[in-house]
């Protein structure tokens, strides 16, 4: 059997392989969001959407059995989960096909199992199939739900989603940038014509010019100087040291 599966993997396309992986019988793990997102993007290609539809159709037809096995329960449940995801994120072409084949979903409203331990899974399948049918039969609700999902995906800038219109995000980014620039201008300190270095230089030069100091005034007794009365002292500058460069 593993050899047969290996042979089948060579003849099936990568798209078919992805859909089969998302709807396999492994109940320990479901399809990841990344895998379902890749499949939803592939629905926008005319070629790959046909391959996706082909695999999903075969999976849904498993529910026609009156006594479904445990394996069928797992595969049908995973297929309905993928269908629900593609209804919100897939192309209009996929939605159109789904509306034209609602009989495949309607059959699952009466899904039956052969093992009583699978009764809970059967109830989940019946409930999910009714939810899918409710959306398919209400165009307004389906359209609103798809728009809400697209808007949410746009808000988180999902890479690779070409069908997403994120023009409102670009406008918001532009507004944020203008606001940031405005705040930076307000917070920027005013510039002066004299820099701090220049002020320091001026202060340093002032100290250089003041290397010498004036000596205190000293009194000298006059010695019969003409024009000066005796006993009257006169003032003179007396340097403190001989190191004064101006002496």
UniProtKB/Swiss-Prot annotation:
InterPro entries listed in its UniProt record: ENTH (IPR013809), ENTH_VHS (IPR008942)
GO cellular component: actin cortical patch; clathrin vesicle coat; cytosol; endosome; plasma membrane
Keywords, ordered alphabetically: Phosphoprotein
S-S bridge residues: none
Organism superkingdom: Eukaryota
Molecular functions (GO terms): clathrin binding; phospholipid binding
PANTHER family: EPSIN-4, EPSIN/ENT-RELATED
The name this protein goes by in its record: Epsin-4
Organism of origin: Saccharomyces cerevisiae (strain ATCC 204508 / S288c) (Baker's yeast)
Boundaries of every ENTH domain copy: 7-146
């Amino acid at each position: 059997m593993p050899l047969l599966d290996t042979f089948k993997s060579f003849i099936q396309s990568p798209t078919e392989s992805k859909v089969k992986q998302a709807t396999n019988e492994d109940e320990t793990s479901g399809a990841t969001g990344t895998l379902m997102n890749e499949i939803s993007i592939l629905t926008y290609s005319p070629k790959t959407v046909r391959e996706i539809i082909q695999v999903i159709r075969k999976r849904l037809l498993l529910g026609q059995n009156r006594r479904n096995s445990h394996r069928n329960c797992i595969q049908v449940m995973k297929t309905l989960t993928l269908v629900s995801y593609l209804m919100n994120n897939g192309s209009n072409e996929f939605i159109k096909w789904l509306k034209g084949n609602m009989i495949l979903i309607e059959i699952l409203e009466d899904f039956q199992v052969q093992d009583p331990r699978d009764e809970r899974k059967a109830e989940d399948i019946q409930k999910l199939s009714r939810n899918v049918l409710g959306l398919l039969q209400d165009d307004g609700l389906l359209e609103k739900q798809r728009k809400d999902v697209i808007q949410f995906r746009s808000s988180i800038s999902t890479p690779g989603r070409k069908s997403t219109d994120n023009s409102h995000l670009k406008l918001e980014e532009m507004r944020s940038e203008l606001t940031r620039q405005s705040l930076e201008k307000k917070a920027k300190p005013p510039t002066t014509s004299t820099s701090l270095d220049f002020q320091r230089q001026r202060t340093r030069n002032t100290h250089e010019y003041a290397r010498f100091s004036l000596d205190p005034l000293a009194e000298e007794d006059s010695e019969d100087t003409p024009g000066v009365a005796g006993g009257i002292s006169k003032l003179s500058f007396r340097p403190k040291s001989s190191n004064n460069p101006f002496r």
